[in-house]
């Protein structure tokens, strides 16, 4: 008998709890719900397919949507009641307990799978041990998802456009309310990708392709939204698809090979429609190309193969199951009498069971995958294995009883039903896995997006830091501009020299951009060798022998944070940049006046600073990440270096290093607590962390650059040449004193001086106390026994007659020692700032003398240029006298050796010492002092009061300048002072031919005399020996007799013009008489006193003592301005309290002392001129001074008195600065 085909709505009996009814309903509900869920997911997946897999030809968008709509229609058909054909053998259905148990197990599995799938159909199947099956089907109302359509109609498009305009393209949920069967995502995608008015569809043009390639090179192949902003009408998705599918140069465009086809088949059987996963196995092929190749070529072949295989299996199964089928009559008995079971059939057709299809590929988690329409097919062996599984035994109390119709055959043969149940459950399981995997993928995608966002945030933070640094840089540039503008305004007060001042300021503008930007090369090398953790710093210190130039030690307060410095974009390095400045200055010096304005224009160019690499980041190779992890907000931290006093990063206690990029610092960022730094400013430096000891109160010149070794030689040569020209011009001025027509020579002199000033600023600002790139010479410490031969280079002498031997000595000292900012000893004299420091200590007026230092800087060049006219006639005799000197290395000067004085040398048990470094508002742990710096009132009024450097300059010019024109005004005198000040700076810098930095010098004998003014009771020679021993002076000058012999030798040389300095004196008695005669002969009888002028002239003369000839030990008393400017010595201020009293009394010079007590000294000024002859003899010195005195007394009366009387009452009673030069020549016969 043929088997009957039955539909799914066949009810087996009238009982609601019939097992078959439950099974079929469960299967029906399960499949319908599953299909609906799959259809919903499929619809979204299809929409995503439309979004993610657009072809580059956008004309195919609507066609793809139509294809997806067809798939949706097929899925909607699956929502209807599905006919489930199965066959029942009538003979084997009775007494089949295993079948019922198997069905119950399948129901439990279905329940578990349904619960895992989070469906709202709660099926609580409670199977009792007694065999009673209480099955309750609690179908809760399901929240139906909004139905979606496939294809958009033109009416819907019009409604969507109006809704979008109504809601301003923002609230897509409100827009979706206008469509009962559309979601907000569908509305958004439809408008953005199809209906947007700015959307460009169609093929890509050549220009668009080129633009995409260019933008990908700029932004990279990820920032498609940024790339789309540059392509009007194109979206980021379009640009991405265009690049990855067509424009990427790595794409393969060859024909598909058989190997690639086989890889696609194998991977498709594993991954399904995960084209991106399959593309990983095919380099050079995109996922879109693989999908198109699969759908166009390989899918048909695969379908044909599947059809042939399914037909063969169907034939084999039909041959096995082609037996007599039972009738569709099922009888059931029940112990309950009121219950009867009947069998109703809707259709009874005799058919063969359908063959099980082939197994489909494994389920896919990709949303792009389409629903598999064919049910899963199983072969006969799988069905037999499933049916042979153990089942729950039928209980005796079970209400369902089957008759044994099959004559003892307990096996029921319903392969279709078994296939339905097992296949249905497996499909549900697969669907559950698909959904979960999809969710997991979405979460992974979200996590990836979050990671990308975090990375973007990190990048933004780094960029913000760079912007902050750049902003700081801009602010500093503004500050520098303000300073330069202020200086321009001040210099505009000079009449005919505004261009000269402009050139100077322009040079400063160029240098300001290089301030504190390039550390020395040795420091960079040491920084690169430092480890990242502080515990290894000791090893580095041992390796560097604790005295290397760039040695760094960990700070107590904050860790070391290494940073890269900014680079100047105008040139490859700051060294080249400095060389360019030097070349420009050389050219301008050759042209002098004609290219004066061109120099101004060239120096105005500001190099663009690139701070992209200056900002430290934790990913920077020179940035210590583990040290800086605890201090993320600190960019630059203080760095301590207590063992190396020349370090670029000096001792810093609590305040960070000052730089143009940062302003969060305290008063004094650079602390050097072991040195008595008298030149430490009392106010914060506004520009750089390094102090310019040459001019502490010059705001512009307080700069630093560390790479300018090559500029020194060039600048020195230029200065030497310009000195010759300037001296000639000054000689012309001396010859034409009363003529106002001398304007053109003066103007030419101004031009020369201006160029010299440019070089001078470059030298001063670049030659700061920083180690240069060349050979580094570390300054000795207190305990170092360093000799001049081991530490100093041989000074080079010039054959030019206008350059003094003292400038050569200055070159040797400059090349030998670095600027430790302490007082240095020199046989040629005391440095101007060192002299002012000593005077400030003795006079308790430290800041006032600092203000006078700027005016004092001009005396050297003017005196040297004025004296050159008188010294030219005696140059022949000077060479013979210089050759007779017996100094070491046959030189006229002793080498200068830097030293660190003891504290008790300067501290005489008083509290009026100048402040030492280390004092800040907040006491530094390195500072021995407790009081902070005091802010002087004079600095706020700098350049305004009557004691300003300008008035002092006017006074000085009227007195000491060789061009004493009676009709010149104060402004012209100030202009001439400005030029002479520049020349003086040139003379200071002429000696630095060895490439070293300028170091302050100090005359040890003068220091001994000055420091003993306050202590007249102490022994002069013991104190002098202590001070002179610090300068490595020869032992012959330490004895009392030699000390007296030096004084007598100088005095005798001044009193007897015809005598030679090499002639020894017979005895101290004759020396005493010669000293008395020399001094008394130079004393006149005009006891006029002008205290302010006297003090200012005194400072200027002391400043000019750097370049005094060493052959003349004590110059004559003279006054360059005439007899109207003769201060007297008061007994309480000079000899009565000076160490000279001990000397004079010991040599029985009572007459000189008596004249001093009775105010009979007529001339108090010690005029020490800079002689421009390296071999000038003492007789030449005397003739020079006498000629200057004669010229000054005849021609400078009015100009001197016109500027000195305004401040004549301010400095009465102040001690007069006195200068005593020691002789470098050993005295014979003592």
UniProtKB/Swiss-Prot annotation:
GO terms of biological process kind: mitotic cell cycle; negative regulation of transcription by RNA polymerase II; positive regulation of transcription by RNA polymerase II
HTH myb-type domain mapped to chain residues: 144-195, 196-251, 252-302
Pro residues bias (residue ranges): 352-364
Location relative to the cell: Nucleus
Biased composition (Basic residues): 368-378, 749-761
Disulfide bond residue pairs: none
Predominant location category: nucleus
Comp. bias intervals (Acidic residues): 61-75
Alphabetized Pfam families for the sequence: Myb_DNA-bind_6 (PF13921), Myb_DNA-binding (PF00249)
Compositionally biased intervals (Polar residues): 316-326, 382-397, 515-529, 612-623, 773-782, 942-954, 1173-1188
Protein name (Swiss-Prot/TrEMBL): Myb-like protein A
Species, as recorded: Dictyostelium discoideum
GO cellular component: nucleus
Functional summary from the UniProt entry: May control cellular differentiation.
Database matches in SMART domains: SANT
GO molecular function: DNA binding; DNA-binding transcription factor activity, RNA polymerase II-specific; RNA polymerase II cis-regulatory region sequence-specific DNA binding
Record has ATP-binding as a keyword: no
Amino acid composition bias (Low complexity), ranges on this chain: 28-60, 115-141, 328-351, 432-514, 576-590, 701-748, 783-814, 853-886, 898-913, 967-978, 1091-1113, 1189-1208
DNA-binding region: 172-195, 224-247, 275-298
This protein's UniProt keywords: DNA-binding, Nucleus, Repeat, Transcription, Transcription regulation
Region (Disordered): 22-79, 115-151, 315-397, 432-529, 573-624, 694-814, 849-954, 967-1001, 1051-1070, 1088-1131, 1163-1230
């Amino acid at each position: 008998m043929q088997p009957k085909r039955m539909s799914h709505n066949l009810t087996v009996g009238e009982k609601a709890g019939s097992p078959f009814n439950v099974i079929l309903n469960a299967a029906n509900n399960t499949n319908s719900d599953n299909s609906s869920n799959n259809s919903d997911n499929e619809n979204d997946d299809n929409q995503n397919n439309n979004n993610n897999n657009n072809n580059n030809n956008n004309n195919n968008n609507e066609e793809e949507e139509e294809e997806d709509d067809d798939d949706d229609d097929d899925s909607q058909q699956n929502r209807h009641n599905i006919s489930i054909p199965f066959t029942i053998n009538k003979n084997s259905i009775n007494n089949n307990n295993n079948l019922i148990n198997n069905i119950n197990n399948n129901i439990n599995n279905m329940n578990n799978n349904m619960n895992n799938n989070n469906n709202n159909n709660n099926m609580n199947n409670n199977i009792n041990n007694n065999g009673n099956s209480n099955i309750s089907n609690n179908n809760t109302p399901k929240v139906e998802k909004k139905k979606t359509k496939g294809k958009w109609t033109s009416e819907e498009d019009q409604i969507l456009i109006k809704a979008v305009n109504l809601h301003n393209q923002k609230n897509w949920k409100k827009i979706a309310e206008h469509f009962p069967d559309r979601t907000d995502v569908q509305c958004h995608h439809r408008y953005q990708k199809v209906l947007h008015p700015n959307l460009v569809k169609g093929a890509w043009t050549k220009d668009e392709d080129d633009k995409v390639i260019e933008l990908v090179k700029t932004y990279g192949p990820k920032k498609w939204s940024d790339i789309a902003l540059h392509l009007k009408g194109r979206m980021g998705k379009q640009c991405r698809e265009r690049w990855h599918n067509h424009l990427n140069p790595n794409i393969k465009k060859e024909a598909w090979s058989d190997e690639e086809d086989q890889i696609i088949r194998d991977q498709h059987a594993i991954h399904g429609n995960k084209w991106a996963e399959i593309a990983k196995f095919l380099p050079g092929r995109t996922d879109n190309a693989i999908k198109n190749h699969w759908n166009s070529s390989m899918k048909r072949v695969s379908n044909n193969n599947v059809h042939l295989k399914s037909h063969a299996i169907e034939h084999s199964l039909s041959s096995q199951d082609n037996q007599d089928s039972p009738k569709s009559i099922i009888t059931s008995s029940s112990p309950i009498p009121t219950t009867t079971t009947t069998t109703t059939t809707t259709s009874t057709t005799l058919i063969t069971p359908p063959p099980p299809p082939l197994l489909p590929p494994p389920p896919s988690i990709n949303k792009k995958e389409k629903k598999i329409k064919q049910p899963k097919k199983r072969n006969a062996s799988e069905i037999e294995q499933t049916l042979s599984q153990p089942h729950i035994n039928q209980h005796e109390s079970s209400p369902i009883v089957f008759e044994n119709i099959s004559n003892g055959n307990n096996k029921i043969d319903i392969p279709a039903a078994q296939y339905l149940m097992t296949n249905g459950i497996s499909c549900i399981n697969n669907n559950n896995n698909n959904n979960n995997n999809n969710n997991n993928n979405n979460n992974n995608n979200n996590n990836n997006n979050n990671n990308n966002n975090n990375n973007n945030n990190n990048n933004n933070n780094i960029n913000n830091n760079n912007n902050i640094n750049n902003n700081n840089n801009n602010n500093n540039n503004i500050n520098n501009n303000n300073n330069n503008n202020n200086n321009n305004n001040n210099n505009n007060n000079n009449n005919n020299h505004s261009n000269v001042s402009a050139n100077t300021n322009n040079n400063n503008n160029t240098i300001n951009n290089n301030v504190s930007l390039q550390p020395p090369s040795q420091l960079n090398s040491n920084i690169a060798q430092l480890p990242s953790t502080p515990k290894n710093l000791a090893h580095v210190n041992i390796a560097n022998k604790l005295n290397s130039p760039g040695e760094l030690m960990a700070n107590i307060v904050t860790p070391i944070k290494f940073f890269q410095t900014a680079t100047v974009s105008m040139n490859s390095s700051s060294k080249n940049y400095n060389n360019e400045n030097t070349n420009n200055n050389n050219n301008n010096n050759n042209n002098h006046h004609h290219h004066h304005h061109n120099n101004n224009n060239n120096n105005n160019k500001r190099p663009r600073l690139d701070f992209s690499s200056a900002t430290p980041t934790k990913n920077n190779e020179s940035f210590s990440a583990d040290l800086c992890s605890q201090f993320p907000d600190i960019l630059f931290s203080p760095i301590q270096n207590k063992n190396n006093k020349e370090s670029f990063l000096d001792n810093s206690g609590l305040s960070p290093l000052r730089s143009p990029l940062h302003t969060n610092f305290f008063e004094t960022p650079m602390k050097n607590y072991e040195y008595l730094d008298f030149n430490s400013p009392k106010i914060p430096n506004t520009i750089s962390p390094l102090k310019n000891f040459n001019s502490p109160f010059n705001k512009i010149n307080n700069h630093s650059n560390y790479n300018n070794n090559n500029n020194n030689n060039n600048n020195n040569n230029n200065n030497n040449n310009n000195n010759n020209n300037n001296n000639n011009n000054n000689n012309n001025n001396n010859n034409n004193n009363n003529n106002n027509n001398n304007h053109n020579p003066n103007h030419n002199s101004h031009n020369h001086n201006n160029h010299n000033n440019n070089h001078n600023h470059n030298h001063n600002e670049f030659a700061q106390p920083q180690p240069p790139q060349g050979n580094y010479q570390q300054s000795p410490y207190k305990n170092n026994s360093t000799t001049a031969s081991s530490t100093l280079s041989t000074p080079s002498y010039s054959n030019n007659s206008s350059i003094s031997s003292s400038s050569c000595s200055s070159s040797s000292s400059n090349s030998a020692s670095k600027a430790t900012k302490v007082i240095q000893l020199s046989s040629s004299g005391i440095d101007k700032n060192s002299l002012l420091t000593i005077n400030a200590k003795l006079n308790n007026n430290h800041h006032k003398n600092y203000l006078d230092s700027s005016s004092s800087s001009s005396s050297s060049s003017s005196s040297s240029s004025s004296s050159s006219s008188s010294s030219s006639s005696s140059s022949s005799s000077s060479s013979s006298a210089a050759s007779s000197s017996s100094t070491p290395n046959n030189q006229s000067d002793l080498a200068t050796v830097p030293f660190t004085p003891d504290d008790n040398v300067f501290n005489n048990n008083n509290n009026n010492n100048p402040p030492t470094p280390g004092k800040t508002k907040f006491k530094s742990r390195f500072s021995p002092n407790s009081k902070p710096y005091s802010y002087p009132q004079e600095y706020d009024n700098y350049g305004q009061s009557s004691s300003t450097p300008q008035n002092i300059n006017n006074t000085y010019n009227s007195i000491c300048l060789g061009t004493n024109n009676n009709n010149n005004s104060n402004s012209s005198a100030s202009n001439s002072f400005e030029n002479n000040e520049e020349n003086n700076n040139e003379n200071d810098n002429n000696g630095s031919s060895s490439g070293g930095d300028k170091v302050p010098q100090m005359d040890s004998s003068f220091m001994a005399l000055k420091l003993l003014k306050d202590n007249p009771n102490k022994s002069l020679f013991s104190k002098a020996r202590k001070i002179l021993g610090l300068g490595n002076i020869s032992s012959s000058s330490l004895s009392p007799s030699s000390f007296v012999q030096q004084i007598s030798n100088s005095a005798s040389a001044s009193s007897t013009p015809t005598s030679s300095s090499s002639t020894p004196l017979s005895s101290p008695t004759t020396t005493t008489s010669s000293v008395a005669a020399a001094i008394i002969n130079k004393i006149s009888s005009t006891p006029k006193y002008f205290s302010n002028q006297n003090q200012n002239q005194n400072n200027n003369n002391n400043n000019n003592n750097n370049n005094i000839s060493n052959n003349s030990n004590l110059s004559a008393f003279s006054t360059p301005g005439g007899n109207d400017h003769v201060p007297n010595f008061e007994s309480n201020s000079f000899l009565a309290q000076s160490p000279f009293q001990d000397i004079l009394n010991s040599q029985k010079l009572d007459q000189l002392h008596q004249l001093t007590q009775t105010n009979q000294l007529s001339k108090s000024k010690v005029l020490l001129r800079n002689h421009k002859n390296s071999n000038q003899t003492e007789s030449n010195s005397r003739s020079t001074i006498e000629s200057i005195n004669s010229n000054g007394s005849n021609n400078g009366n009015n100009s001197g008195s016109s500027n000195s009387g305004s401040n004549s009452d301010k400095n009465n009673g102040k001690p007069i600065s006195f200068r005593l030069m020691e002789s470098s020549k050993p005295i014979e016969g003592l």
